[in-house]
Design a protein with these regions (language model features):
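Helix-to-loop junction immediately C-terminal to a conserved catalytic motif
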Residues: 50
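Catalytic Walker B motif of ABC-type/P-loop ATPase nucleotide-binding domains
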Residues: 163-167
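Conserved ABC ATPase "signature" region
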Residues: 114-133, 182-185, 234
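The feature captures the beta-strand-to-loop junction immediately N-terminal to the Walker
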Residues: 35-37
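Conserved ABC nucleotide-binding domain
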Residues: 68-69, 124-140, 161
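H-loop/switch region of ABC-family ATPase nucleotide-binding domains
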Residues: 199-200
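A short, surface-exposed alpha-helical micro-motif characterized by mixed small hydrophobic
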Residues: 205-207
Length: 244
């Protein structure tokens, strides 16, 4: 059974059909890239998976259980975290406090003591190289540091199964990108976290993705490795423009 599965997922906004019969499956521990031209429906699909939008038809299943149509908070507690292209943090709170607030939001009935949550936050601050700025307000951090903090907030989830990342590398200094990649690898290796990564950064996607899904005009056009996508004439014409 796949970790995540969408079936015939459709969503329209007025006369615009943003997704059309999207059928996607992701296995535990998989890193899946989601690529395609602007307006292809990638972010809409991410929003459908994470409960921000309810589908017009079709369904979303996590470990076989339907999660579509439920509140984003319930989807999060079920094991799905999400980052946004525009970083969402509590600017007046310290980096450490942002992590602890994130844990409180998703922990539910998880039996983790406050001391264990603080230890988890400290460990993540070390992994993300943010320990030196742990007690600074998030608003005082650089763009790269805020991106790392937002990513780490999702890793506070005690039952994280799938992490949906929307343009996590856009506008980020290469030094911070390497730290992001280290974090993704660490949690995949130790916790079998799966990722759905929306990005236009093809060189990075080549390095980390097991497979990519190409969306065009709201529908899945191609699935395979990035090398296979880069050799597909339709993908080249509609999106890549040239081999990568």
């Amino acid at each position: 059974m796949p970790l995540l599965e969408t079936r015939d997922l459709c969503k329209s906004f007025g006369g615009l059909q943003a997704t059309r019969d999207v059928a996607l499956s992701i296995d535990a521990g998989e890193i899946r890239g989601l690529i395609g031209p602007n307006g292809a429906g990638k972010t809409t699909l991410a929003n459908l998976i994470t409960g921000i939008y309810a589908p017009d038809s079709g369904d979303v299943r996590l470990r076989g259980e339907r999660i579509d149509g439920t509140r984003p908070s319930r989807v999060a507690r079920a094991g799905i975290a999400r980052t946004f292209q525009n970083t969402r943090l509590f600017g007046s709170l310290s980096a450490r406090k942002n992590l602890l607030v994130s844990y409180d939001a998703v922990s539910g009935s998880a039996l983790v003591s406050p001391a264990a949550a603080r230890e988890r936050a400290g460990h993540l601050l070390e992994l993300s190289r943010l320990a030196a700025v742990a007690d600074l307000p998030a608003a005082a951090l650089s763009g790269g540091q805020r991106a790392l903090l937002q990513l780490s907030c999702g890793f506070m989830h005690p039952r994280l199964a799938l992490y949906v990342l929307d343009e996590p590398f856009a506008g980020i200094n290469p030094v911070f990108i390497e730290t992001i990649l280290e974090l993704l690898s660490h949690h995949r290796q130790h916790n079998e976290v799966a990722y759905l990564i929306v990005s236009h950064e093809m060189e990075i996607m080549r390095r980390i993705c097991d497979r990519v899904t190409v969306m065009i005009d709201g529908a899945i056009y191609f699935e395979g490795t990035l090398a296979e996508a880069a050799a597909n004439e339709g993908v080249i014409d509609a999106y890549l423009g040239r081999p990568v």
